[in-house]
C-alpha cells in the first residue's frame, strides 16, 4: 500500500457555499484522511508565493485576488495514492469538463471559481504541504484494513 500525503485547499467559493463538510466527507469516503487542517485567510504575499509558478500566466492576478477574497480551508490528506485519488475526487479543473459526482462538477461554478485545489504530483505535494504546514502540525492515525 503506497501511503502518500497531498495538499488540498477548499477555496473561498467553497466556504461561501457552505460545503466544507460535504467536501471533507467525500475525501474520507474514498479513504483520504485529513491529518492536518486549518481555516486561514491568505495574505496577498502567501497567495502570490503559493501560485508563483503561474506568475507569467494571464490569470495570475485574478487567481491571487480570488484566493485572498475570503478564508480557505488548508488540509493535508493522507491515504493510498493520495495525490491521484484527490485529483480524481476533485474532477477536471474546468467544472464543465468534470465527471459527474466530482467535487468540481457538483460545487464549482467556473474554471476560475473551481472550489478546490489539489497537488498535481507527489513532488509538488511535498513542496505545497511544507509551504503551509510544519511537520509537527501533521498527524497520522491507524488505518483500518
From Swiss-Prot:
<dbReference type="GO" id="GO:0006183">
    <property type="term" value="P:GTP biosynthetic process"/>
</dbReference>
<keyword id="KW-0963">Cytoplasm</keyword>
<dbReference type="Pfam" id="PF00334">
    <property type="entry name" value="NDK"/>
</dbReference>
<keyword id="KW-0808">Transferase</keyword>
<dbReference type="GO" id="GO:0005524">
    <property type="term" value="F:ATP binding"/>
</dbReference>
<comment type="function">
    <text>Major role in the synthesis of nucleoside triphosphates other than ATP. The ATP gamma phosphate is transferred to the NDP beta phosphate via a ping-pong mechanism, using a phosphorylated active-site intermediate.</text>
</comment>
<dbReference type="GO" id="GO:0006228">
    <property type="term" value="P:UTP biosynthetic process"/>
</dbReference>
<comment type="subunit">
    <text>Homotetramer.</text>
</comment>
<dbReference type="GO" id="GO:0046872">
    <property type="term" value="F:metal ion binding"/>
</dbReference>
<keyword id="KW-0067">ATP-binding</keyword>
<keyword id="KW-0418">Kinase</keyword>
<feature type="binding site">
    <location>
        <position position="11"/>
    </location>
    <ligand>
        <name>ATP</name>
    </ligand>
</feature>
<dbReference type="GO" id="GO:0004550">
    <property type="term" value="F:nucleoside diphosphate kinase activity"/>
</dbReference>
<dbReference type="InterPro" id="IPR001564">
    <property type="entry name" value="Nucleoside_diP_kinase"/>
</dbReference>
<dbReference type="GO" id="GO:0006241">
    <property type="term" value="P:CTP biosynthetic process"/>
</dbReference>
<feature type="binding site">
    <location>
        <position position="59"/>
    </location>
    <ligand>
        <name>ATP</name>
    </ligand>
</feature>
<keyword id="KW-0597">Phosphoprotein</keyword>
<comment type="similarity">
    <text>Belongs to the NDK family.</text>
</comment>
<protein>
    <recommendedName>
        <fullName>Nucleoside diphosphate kinase</fullName>
        <ecNumber>2.7.4.6</ecNumber>
    </recommendedName>
</protein>
<feature type="binding site">
    <location>
        <position position="93"/>
    </location>
    <ligand>
        <name>ATP</name>
    </ligand>
</feature>
<keyword id="KW-0547">Nucleotide-binding</keyword>
<feature type="binding site">
    <location>
        <position position="87"/>
    </location>
    <ligand>
        <name>ATP</name>
    </ligand>
</feature>
<keyword id="KW-0546">Nucleotide metabolism</keyword>
<keyword id="KW-0479">Metal-binding</keyword>
<keyword id="KW-0460">Magnesium</keyword>
<feature type="active site" description="Pros-phosphohistidine intermediate">
    <location>
        <position position="117"/>
    </location>
</feature>
<dbReference type="InterPro" id="IPR034907">
    <property type="entry name" value="NDK-like_dom"/>
</dbReference>
<feature type="binding site">
    <location>
        <position position="114"/>
    </location>
    <ligand>
        <name>ATP</name>
    </ligand>
</feature>
<dbReference type="InterPro" id="IPR036850">
    <property type="entry name" value="NDK-like_dom_sf"/>
</dbReference>
<feature type="binding site">
    <location>
        <position position="104"/>
    </location>
    <ligand>
        <name>ATP</name>
    </ligand>
</feature>
<dbReference type="GO" id="GO:0005737">
    <property type="term" value="C:cytoplasm"/>
</dbReference>
<dbReference type="InterPro" id="IPR023005">
    <property type="entry name" value="Nucleoside_diP_kinase_AS"/>
</dbReference>
Amino acid at each position: 500500500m503506497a501511503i502518500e500525503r497531498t495538499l488540498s485547499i477548499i477555496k473561498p467559493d467553497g466556504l461561501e457555499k457552505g460545503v466544507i463538510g460535504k467536501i471533507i466527507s467525500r475525501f474520507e469516503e474514498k479513504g483520504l484522511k485529513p491529518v492536518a487542517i486549518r481555516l486561514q485567510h491568505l495574505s496577498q504575499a502567501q497567495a502570490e508565493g503559493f501560485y508563483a509558478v503561474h506568475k507569467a500566466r494571464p490569470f495570475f492576478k485574478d487567481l491571487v485576488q480570488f484566493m485572498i477574497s475570503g478564508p480557505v480551508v488548508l488540509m493535508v490528506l493522507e491515504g493510498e495514492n493520495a495525490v491521484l485519488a484527490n485529483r480524481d475526487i476533485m474532477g477536471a479543473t474546468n467544472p464543465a469538463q468534470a465527471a459527474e459526482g466530482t467535487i468540481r462538477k457538483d460545487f464549482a461554478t467556473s474554471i476560475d471559481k473551481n472550489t478546490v485545489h489539489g497537488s498535481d504530483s507527489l513532488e509538488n505535494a511535498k513542496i505545497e504541504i511544507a509551504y503551509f504546514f510544519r511537520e509537527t502540525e501533521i498527524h497520522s492515525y491507524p488505518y483500518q484494513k
